């Protein structure tokens, strides 16, 4: 059985994910930044990450459950980091408008598979550099947040791995 302190990795992870979500909604509502398709996809993954961590805190599973939750949370955070890295690349690349042709308002007028593809590819709104803080744009902050959120489940998995190696 994993010690209780490994289970407590999920509470700070949940709180940090919720803080990032609140910050993104605050930027939308107070500053007026409208989310692009990649931002919406990242919010969805961030919400999934927060729900996974919250479920892990509430359920307080055994060793196998903790490892499953950690793997799922790590998958969510790495997928979010990949989307954020793509967003950063789109903002820095020249001539990628043909890659992301549809604005967010028309994404859901298409089939579900096409809408999912557009949410993952991004839209023309994804290239705008409307906001920055400490010389980092919002997608760069998202990438940093997802990478930091990946550290918590990764440390849980590594702690379990080193603990099992120490027993043998």
Swiss-Prot record:
<dbReference type="GO" id="GO:0006457">
    <property type="term" value="P:protein folding"/>
</dbReference>
<keyword id="KW-1133">Transmembrane helix</keyword>
<feature type="topological domain" description="Periplasmic">
    <location>
        <begin position="86"/>
        <end position="140"/>
    </location>
</feature>
<keyword id="KW-0249">Electron transport</keyword>
<feature type="disulfide bond" description="Redox-active">
    <location>
        <begin position="36"/>
        <end position="39"/>
    </location>
</feature>
<feature type="topological domain" description="Cytoplasmic">
    <location>
        <begin position="160"/>
        <end position="168"/>
    </location>
</feature>
<feature type="transmembrane region" description="Helical">
    <location>
        <begin position="68"/>
        <end position="85"/>
    </location>
</feature>
<dbReference type="InterPro" id="IPR050183">
    <property type="entry name" value="DsbB"/>
</dbReference>
<dbReference type="GO" id="GO:0005886">
    <property type="term" value="C:plasma membrane"/>
</dbReference>
<keyword id="KW-0997">Cell inner membrane</keyword>
<feature type="topological domain" description="Cytoplasmic">
    <location>
        <begin position="62"/>
        <end position="67"/>
    </location>
</feature>
<keyword id="KW-0143">Chaperone</keyword>
<protein>
    <recommendedName>
        <fullName>Disulfide bond formation protein B 2</fullName>
    </recommendedName>
</protein>
<comment type="similarity">
    <text>Belongs to the DsbB family.</text>
</comment>
<feature type="topological domain" description="Cytoplasmic">
    <location>
        <begin position="1"/>
        <end position="9"/>
    </location>
</feature>
<keyword id="KW-0813">Transport</keyword>
<dbReference type="InterPro" id="IPR003752">
    <property type="entry name" value="DiS_bond_form_DsbB/BdbC"/>
</dbReference>
<keyword id="KW-0812">Transmembrane</keyword>
<dbReference type="GO" id="GO:0009055">
    <property type="term" value="F:electron transfer activity"/>
</dbReference>
<dbReference type="GO" id="GO:0015035">
    <property type="term" value="F:protein-disulfide reductase activity"/>
</dbReference>
<dbReference type="Pfam" id="PF02600">
    <property type="entry name" value="DsbB"/>
</dbReference>
<comment type="function">
    <text>Required for disulfide bond formation in some periplasmic proteins. Acts by oxidizing the DsbA protein.</text>
</comment>
<keyword id="KW-0472">Membrane</keyword>
<dbReference type="InterPro" id="IPR022920">
    <property type="entry name" value="Disulphide_bond_form_DsbB"/>
</dbReference>
<keyword id="KW-0676">Redox-active center</keyword>
<feature type="topological domain" description="Periplasmic">
    <location>
        <begin position="27"/>
        <end position="44"/>
    </location>
</feature>
<keyword id="KW-0560">Oxidoreductase</keyword>
<dbReference type="InterPro" id="IPR023380">
    <property type="entry name" value="DsbB-like_sf"/>
</dbReference>
<keyword id="KW-1003">Cell membrane</keyword>
<keyword id="KW-1015">Disulfide bond</keyword>
<feature type="transmembrane region" description="Helical">
    <location>
        <begin position="45"/>
        <end position="61"/>
    </location>
</feature>
<feature type="disulfide bond" description="Redox-active">
    <location>
        <begin position="100"/>
        <end position="126"/>
    </location>
</feature>
<feature type="transmembrane region" description="Helical">
    <location>
        <begin position="10"/>
        <end position="26"/>
    </location>
</feature>
<feature type="transmembrane region" description="Helical">
    <location>
        <begin position="141"/>
        <end position="159"/>
    </location>
</feature>
């Amino acid at each position: 059985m994993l010690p209780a302190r490994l289970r407590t990795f999920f509470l700070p992870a949940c709180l940090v994910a919720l803080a990032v979500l609140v910050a993104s909604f605050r930027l939308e509502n107070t500053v007026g930044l409208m989310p692009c398709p990649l931002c919406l996809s990242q919010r969805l993954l961030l919400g999934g990450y927060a729900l996974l961590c919250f479920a892990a805190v509430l359920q307080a599973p055994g060793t196998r459950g903790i490892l499953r939750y950690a793997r799922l949370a790590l998958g969510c955070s790495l997928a979010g980091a990949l989307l954020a890295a793509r967003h950063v690349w789109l903002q820095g690349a020249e001539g990628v408008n043909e890659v992301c042709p549809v604005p967010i308002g028309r994404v859901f007028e298409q089939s579900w598979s096409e809408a999912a593809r557009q949410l993952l590819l991004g839209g023309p709104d994804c290239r705008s550099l409307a906001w920055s803080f400490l010389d980092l744009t919002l997608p760069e902050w998202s990438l940093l947040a997802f990478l930091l959120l990946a550290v918590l489940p990764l440390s849980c998995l590594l702690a379990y791995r080193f603990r099992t190696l120490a027993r043998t």
